[in-house]
């Protein structure tokens, strides 16, 4: 009531001033109309709260023993994952330089020859290597799930190291690395277990690489040789190392599908060829070049993929004849004359070997001498005039699959 009186007096005082006070009066009136609320003591309030909680459904609480038991089960399940994989691995800590050190050294040919180790990257190469019997020494991986991709018995004796994917990406030569890098003992072609499907389709066809120095070309040539069913690939001294990482990537596992024998002298090349094998040369010589003379340039294609010392050469159908003023010298170059024929003519009716020369240095004189000794020929692939020689990998693929076709047709006629 006192509040109402104060509001009325205030309204009377402010009314002459022209101010509105209806809102204040109504507020006080509403305050008088409220129903009183019973005030509960603290004890009664606590008793009502307990009654409400008593009416709620009770949920069983885990005892301390049950809590410890459940934690033990979770820990046991985490520990059983390692025995399920049947091998242990270690996690590389930040600052671990084992990956960078091993990868850097393994990319060196001197290290590969001295320590007998090679670097393989990617699931495909690792799988082919393990299936062929290659010995895995160290495996770097970025995810534990990757270990399930390989047979457990092949990983038991290896050193397994889990590293960050960013580290693999830094040291990988691949644009999109898969997170797998392995260090293997350098495989021996005599101890490798080649796939049964590969050996079943092997033909009496060999490939000799002479001065192939481009890693991509050599890898592609090895892949073509495996696809054509060659029984072996011989690499003479001067070729790029077959276990170079770029060669391995371009080969797509061909190293583990057929014997690849490296660093051979021409004197021992015939020891790796079966008796009666004819040697044919992939040559850029064309019959329409008869009696054309010119200075020998550094391009092998200018004189039929045959690399010689710079001097003038007379190119004829019978062969390459030197017209140098130094003919009377003791070191006069002898280039054997070999018959030339088109690659699609009949030439692969018996065991044969094809020699592919590099694009820069071409065929060596030793290859011509070997072909002459085995009654071989020069095989040329017709191309449009004034076009440079074909890529060595392309020429190899054309001749290999043509040889495969002719050998298979001969075998069908005999059967």
Curated annotation (Swiss-Prot):
Residue numbers spanned by region Disordered: 41-73
Record's keyword terms, sorted: Methyltransferase, Mitochondrion, rRNA processing, S-adenosyl-L-methionine, Transferase, Transit peptide
Enzyme's top EC category: transferase
Keyword Nucleus: no
Coiled coil: none
Single Gene Ontology MF annotation: rRNA (uridine-2'-O-)-methyltransferase activity
Compartments where located: Mitochondrion
Residue range of the transit peptide in the UniProt record, numbered on this chain: 1-47
Function summary: S-adenosyl-L-methionine-dependent 2'-O-ribose methyltransferase that catalyzes the formation of 2'-O-methylguanosine at position 1370 (Gm1370) in the mitochondrial large subunit ribosomal RNA (mtLSU rRNA), a conserved modification in the peptidyl transferase domain of the mtLSU rRNA. Also required for formation of 2'-O-methyluridine at position 1369 (Um1369) mediated by MRM2.
The name this protein goes by in its record: rRNA methyltransferase 3, mitochondrial
Native species: Xenopus tropicalis (Western clawed frog)
Primary gene name: mrm3
